A protein has these predicted regions:
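Histidine-/acidic-rich catalytic cores in large beta-rich domains
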Residues: 1-178
């Protein structure tokens, strides 16, 4: 089977709970990449909509056998969009892999976290990347035979303070974390 991402608009009431990101960068806000034809000047500079991903498992015959709406699994208090990224997608994923136990592991570039998604409960089983363990723009997570996780941390806009606040500094750095 194959897991694909299906884009879906988040319920407007749930959208109000989502924190962080660049104000006005929602779909239909002042984000020209999403909301305006080439060469036209944006006219609507208000807040637009936020979309999510629905992880969808398909058989080789394109039969849907499992779905998980990530916006229902995320916690708006914990899963905050990083300050210098857009608010058009919550979360934005850049990789996903199946673990030996059947659960899924992925990274979110705009939440700067690693997630293990529990396929049975459709909830976040584990997240990494906050506070003193802060990572930034991670990708390519893999579960190892010993149960550990290995991933790549781009280190972009990494926070200078140990509690993971908003003191961002250059230069970017890269590292592999286990």
């Amino acid at each position: 089977n194959t897991i694909v991402n299906i884009v879906k608009k988040i319920d407007p009431e749930r959208q109000k709970l989502i924190k962080g990101g660049l104000p006005g960068s929602e779909v239909g806000g002042n984000n020209p990449a999403w909301s305006h034809k080439a060469g036209e000047r944006p006219t609507d500079l208000g807040q637009g909509d936020i979309y999510t991903l629905v992880l969808t498992e398909l058989t080789p015959d394109n039969e849907v056998v499992w779905e998980m709406d990530l916006s229902e699994a995320l916690d708006p208090e914990l899963d905050v969009i990083t300050p210098l990224t857009g608010r058009s997608l919550w979360p934005g994923l850049n990789s996903i892999d199946e673990l030996p136990d059947g659960n899924l592991i992925s990274t979110s570039y705009n939440l700067s976290q690693v997630y293990i998604w529990d396929k049975e409960t459709k909830k976040v089983k584990w997240r990494f990347g906050q506070g003193k363990d802060r990572i930034s723009f991670p990708h390519d997570p893999h579960g190892l035979e010993n149960g550990n996780v290995i991933l790549f941390d781009n280190g972009r806009f990494h926070s200078a303070d140990p509690d993971g606040g908003t003191n961002f500094f250059p230069p970017d750095f890269s590292r592999v974390i286990e």
